[in-house]
Amino acid sequence: MYLFVNIIWRNFISKNNLPKANREIRAREVRLVDENSEMHGVVNIREALDMAERAGLDLVEISPNAVPPVCKILDFGKFKYENKKRLHEARKKQKIVVLKEMKFKPNISIGDFETKLRKIKEFLKDGDKVKISLWFKGREILHKEVGHELFKRIELALEGLIKIDQHAKMEGKQMIMIISPDIKV
């Protein structure tokens, strides 16, 4: 029973994002475009199906919202393949931007600062955004100017490589700044 329902559900989902073809088209009249992209005007659905059958191709509803719907005579298998290929190419070209975080403390040593700075540069080269957070503990929060100085040092060290998306601001017991790679570089 479960397998049967699963097969029906899978077919229901996969058919929803495809255009209607051949006998699935419910309109009485359609605006027909043949395989050579020539307009035949408004035609009865039976005539359109006969023309598609004679050509050995399928009648595919291209624009279902038009009145009457626009249908084209073409190879539906090839149409699905090209559509799938186009979606795959678009997905491949998509760039996912990741937000990386680098945590600092107000009294960071020079060596640790340079190491973290080197890691931030790697993140920026990969095209990722970086959230720089400065954690204050106890009474360190009374000296926010130390945090601002640290962020200025970071900005100067990365000058020309970054674009500041969000300037330094306090959120609870931490100061945050978000940077991204400068596109010009």
Curated annotation (Swiss-Prot):
<comment type="subunit">
    <text>Monomer.</text>
</comment>
<dbReference type="GO" id="GO:0003743">
    <property type="term" value="F:translation initiation factor activity"/>
</dbReference>
<dbReference type="InterPro" id="IPR019814">
    <property type="entry name" value="Translation_initiation_fac_3_N"/>
</dbReference>
<dbReference type="Pfam" id="PF00707">
    <property type="entry name" value="IF3_C"/>
</dbReference>
<dbReference type="Pfam" id="PF05198">
    <property type="entry name" value="IF3_N"/>
</dbReference>
<dbReference type="GO" id="GO:0032790">
    <property type="term" value="P:ribosome disassembly"/>
</dbReference>
<keyword id="KW-0963">Cytoplasm</keyword>
<dbReference type="InterPro" id="IPR036787">
    <property type="entry name" value="T_IF-3_N_sf"/>
</dbReference>
<comment type="function">
    <text>IF-3 binds to the 30S ribosomal subunit and shifts the equilibrium between 70S ribosomes and their 50S and 30S subunits in favor of the free subunits, thus enhancing the availability of 30S subunits on which protein synthesis initiation begins.</text>
</comment>
<keyword id="KW-0648">Protein biosynthesis</keyword>
<dbReference type="GO" id="GO:0016020">
    <property type="term" value="C:membrane"/>
</dbReference>
<dbReference type="InterPro" id="IPR019813">
    <property type="entry name" value="Translation_initiation_fac3_CS"/>
</dbReference>
<protein>
    <recommendedName>
        <fullName>Translation initiation factor IF-3</fullName>
    </recommendedName>
</protein>
<keyword id="KW-0396">Initiation factor</keyword>
<dbReference type="GO" id="GO:0043022">
    <property type="term" value="F:ribosome binding"/>
</dbReference>
<dbReference type="GO" id="GO:0005829">
    <property type="term" value="C:cytosol"/>
</dbReference>
<dbReference type="InterPro" id="IPR019815">
    <property type="entry name" value="Translation_initiation_fac_3_C"/>
</dbReference>
<comment type="similarity">
    <text>Belongs to the IF-3 family.</text>
</comment>
<dbReference type="InterPro" id="IPR001288">
    <property type="entry name" value="Translation_initiation_fac_3"/>
</dbReference>
<dbReference type="InterPro" id="IPR036788">
    <property type="entry name" value="T_IF-3_C_sf"/>
</dbReference>
